[in-house]
Amino acid sequence: MGIIAAGATSIPQDKCQRLTRHVWKHMRLSPFSTSLQPASGIIKTMRGDCTEHAVLLSTLMRSQGIPSRVVVGFVYVTNPASYAPHMWTEALLNGKWIPFDSTRGPAGVGLTHIKVTDSTLSDEVGSGTVLFVPLLSFLGRATVDLALD
């Protein structure tokens, strides 16, 4: 799947963008689940919440030789207007971790995303809930102010 989705390009940034588009286009969103599916299970159903999107995208990037990890934080949602817990992917490109979000489509990652922590998933077992524990310290206590120049 990774070879087909990445296309013929040899440029890692382009591969990541193509893989992100592929996951966004072919996966169906489902309600949040507390279990963390392995990529092999996600490929079979091609459905999941932000955690499955991030895990699959990270796995596809790694299959192309691109170091990647998942990120846990908050994303702005409009209904109701607030920041909600979310997971997306980062790829190591030219020595910098660059964010990609296959649940947001062409919108990508920007000011709508607030990173709290990241993981290679090598130390978490079974439950996606463990990854979201660091967010608990922010709930009900944090405010976000944007200053536009």
Name each model feature, range by range.
Residues 19, 46-74, 89-90:
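Cysteine-centered nucleophilic/redox motifs
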Residues 29-32, 36, 70-80:
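Catalytic cysteine-centered active-site loop
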Residues 21, 63, 76-77, 81-149:
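Active-site rim recognition segments
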Residues 11-18, 52, 56, 65, ...:
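Generic recognition of stable, solvent-exposed alpha-helical segments in well-folded globular domains
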